[in-house]
């Protein structure tokens, strides 16, 4: 099926919605199974454990609130919960993406071929195995870019007042951008586009990518829905690649 997508500007919300539609397309579902299983096992177990710990972690986090802000505690408590969900959700989402990276790349490749009618390179289990070292190197590049920035934001959580008010907002914006990078990178990497060049390309449509990443981040925090978010986000990001970036960066057509 050749895509009916156009180059007309679309919002990140549109591409996120497209991900939910594309993930169930005939011929694509079989490439969704492995990423979906990885996400269900890891995110399902992680969030079950998280919800058993919230009654311990939230009071600890609230203990950093200074006395002069105690009158706002009824507002800060939900922010503290959201903060924990954001950090925890992104952390385990990153682990799940590491484990499923080769299969996410294959899903992006097959969906792109279906949307465009292009012929991808010959792939299969041996092709995936051959690409694993390169794919893991790319994941390390993303992690190296992410880690120092995440550490700075996590330190902000320890500053009384700021940690319970400003830090959650900054973390949400950061995680939105990082999740856009994470999922958009699969089709870019399939075409051997360097990591730095990929980030530069995403910045040309920063609002679209922030919208896409923000919705992905929100759904990562929602129990049950977060079990399906990885393949959905891969499909949505691939649709965005086809519309917005493929003409300039594609290696195979």
UniProtKB/Swiss-Prot annotation:
Its main location: membrane. GO terms for cellular component: plasma membrane. It is found in: Cell inner membrane. It is a multi-pass membrane protein. One of its GO terms (biological process) is cysteine biosynthetic process. Keywords: Amino-acid biosynthesis, Cell inner membrane, Cell membrane, Cysteine biosynthesis, Membrane, Sulfate transport, Transmembrane, Transmembrane helix, Transport. The chain crosses the membrane at residues 31-51, 75-95, 151-171, 222-242. GO terms for molecular function: high-affinity sulfate:proton symporter activity. InterPro entries: CysZ_sulfate_transptr, Sulfate_CysZ. High affinity, high specificity proton-dependent sulfate transporter, which mediates sulfate uptake. Provides the sulfur source for the cysteine synthesis pathway. Belongs to the CysZ family. PANTHER family: SULFATE TRANSPORTER CYSZ. This is Sulfate transporter CysZ.
């Amino acid at each position: 099926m050749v895509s009916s997508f156009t180059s007309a500007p679309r919002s990140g919300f549109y591409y996120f919605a497209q991900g939910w539609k594309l993930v169930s397309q005939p011929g694509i579902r079989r490439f969704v199974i492995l990423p979906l299983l990885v996400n269900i096992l890891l995110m399902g177990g992680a969030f079950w454990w998280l919800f058993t710990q919230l009654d311990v972690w939230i009071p600890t986090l609230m203990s950093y609130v200074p006395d002069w802000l105690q009158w706002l505690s009824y507002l800060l408590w939900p922010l503290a919960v959201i903060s924990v969900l954001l950090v925890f959700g992104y952390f385990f989402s990153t682990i799940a993406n590491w484990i499923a990276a080769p299969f996410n790349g294959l899903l992006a490749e097959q969906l792109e071929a279906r949307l465009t009618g292009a012929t991808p390179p010959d792939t299969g289990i041996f092709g995936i195995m051959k690409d694993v070292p390169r794919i893991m190197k790319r994941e390390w590049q993303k992690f190296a870019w992410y880690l120092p920035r995440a550490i700075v934001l996590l330190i902000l959580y320890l500053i009384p007042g700021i940690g319970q008010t400003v830090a959650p907002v900054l973390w949400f914006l950061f995680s939105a951008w990082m999740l856009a990078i994470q999922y958009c990178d699969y089709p870019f990497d399939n075409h051997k586009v360097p990591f730095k060049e990929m980030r530069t390309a995403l910045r040309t449509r920063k609002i679209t990518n922030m919208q896409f990443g923000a919705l992905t981040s929100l759904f990562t925090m929602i129990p049950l829905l977060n079990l399906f978010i990885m393949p959905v986000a891969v499909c949505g990001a691939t649709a965005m690649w086809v519309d917005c970036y493929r003409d300039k960066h594609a290696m195979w057509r």
